């Protein structure tokens, strides 16, 4: 029996795949558990239109991510942290601090999408990578300054 998988199944395939399985397996397990549906002409057409819509949606998200990347590259971010007289920070600058600085500039980016090469424990200029989409990553330049010493 031909079925369309609605969920990923390790032994059969990924969601959206059309696979052939034994009738008993489909009727007694896959279909009742909502893991798969019967592959009829109507469901195959619906699957195809859904894939096209999904592809358009992904392309729009990718385009939006590229536009955001261009804007973020132009930014001159400043991150403020408490520091001692010698310029050494009390603590470290984290991806959450960078996400907060980006939010202040109008970019809502999750801290888990920001990667910092090494811990930042001093004042100065640094760079972090921001992954906006699966294939869109942008380098963010930022400067760590001591709190209360705005220029």
Curated annotation (Swiss-Prot):
Keywords: Ribonucleoprotein, Ribosomal protein, RNA-binding, rRNA-binding. Pfam families: Ribosomal_L9_C (PF03948), Ribosomal_L9_N (PF01281). GO terms for biological process: translation. It comes from the Bacteria. One of its GO terms (cellular component) is ribosome. SUPFAM superfamilies: L9 N-domain-like, Ribosomal protein L9 C-domain. The keyword Ribonucleoprotein applies. One of its GO terms (molecular function) is rRNA binding. PANTHER family: 50S RIBOSOMAL PROTEIN L9 (PTHR21368). Belongs to the bacterial ribosomal protein bL9 family. Binds to the 23S rRNA. NCBIfam families: L9. This is Large ribosomal subunit protein bL9. The gene is rplI.
């Amino acid at each position: 029996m031909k079925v369309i998988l609605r969920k990923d199944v390790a032994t059969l395939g990924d969601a959206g795949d059309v696979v052939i399985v034994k009738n008993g397996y489909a009727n007694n397990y896959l279909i009742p558990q909502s893991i798969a549906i019967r592959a009829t002409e109507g469901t195959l057409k619906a699957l195809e239109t859904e894939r096209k819509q999904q592809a358009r949606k992904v392309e729009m998200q990718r385009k939006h991510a590229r536009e955001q990347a261009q804007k973020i590259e132009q930014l001159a971010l400043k991150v403020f942290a408490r520091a001692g007289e010698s310029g050494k920070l009390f603590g470290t600058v984290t991806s959450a601090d960078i996400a907060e600085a980006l939010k202040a500039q109008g970019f809502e980016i999750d801290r888990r999408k920001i990667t910092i090469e090494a811990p930042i424990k001093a004042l100065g200029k640094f760079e972090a990578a921001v992954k906006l989409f699966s294939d869109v990553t942008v380098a963010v330049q930022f400067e760590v300054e001591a709190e209360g010493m705005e220029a």
